[in-house]
């Protein structure tokens, strides 16, 4: 059985690992997952992104962050999904928690935050909300 929505699986693994107070979480790697993980690291939601290559398959390992025993990521929600893609123009990119969270957007210039997409003046597919 093949996995249908790998990004939703990634976000669920991160959410479950943080609820279980794990330090790291591992998953199968892809270019999209690595790009999303790099955005999360740049924004300070996770501490480290590591890709390990074992023969034919690559594994993505994320080091999670906690502040005073609580996970740094409060909520993570998949927005655009395989059954209902969510595309937004440059003027319609949503703001998460009035700017306290981020929206991860897939644009023609790559994966970036909502703020970076607005600054670049480009829209795209809204992948997820993180706060």
Swiss-Prot record:
Official protein name in the record: Small ribosomal subunit protein uS8
GO MF annotation list: rRNA binding; structural constituent of ribosome
Highest taxon of the lineage: Bacteria
GO biological process, alphabetically ordered: translation
Subunit structure comment from the entry: Part of the 30S ribosomal subunit. Contacts proteins S5 and S12.
Cross-referenced Pfam families: Ribosomal_S8
Keywords noted in UniProt: Ribonucleoprotein, Ribosomal protein, RNA-binding, rRNA-binding
Organism whose genome encodes this protein: Acinetobacter baylyi (strain ATCC 33305 / BD413 / ADP1)
GO cellular component terms, A-Z: ribonucleoprotein complex; ribosome
PROSITE patterns: RIBOSOMAL_S8 (PS00053)
Function text: One of the primary rRNA binding proteins, it binds directly to 16S rRNA central domain where it helps coordinate assembly of the platform of the 30S subunit.
Record family assignment: Belongs to the universal ribosomal protein uS8 family.
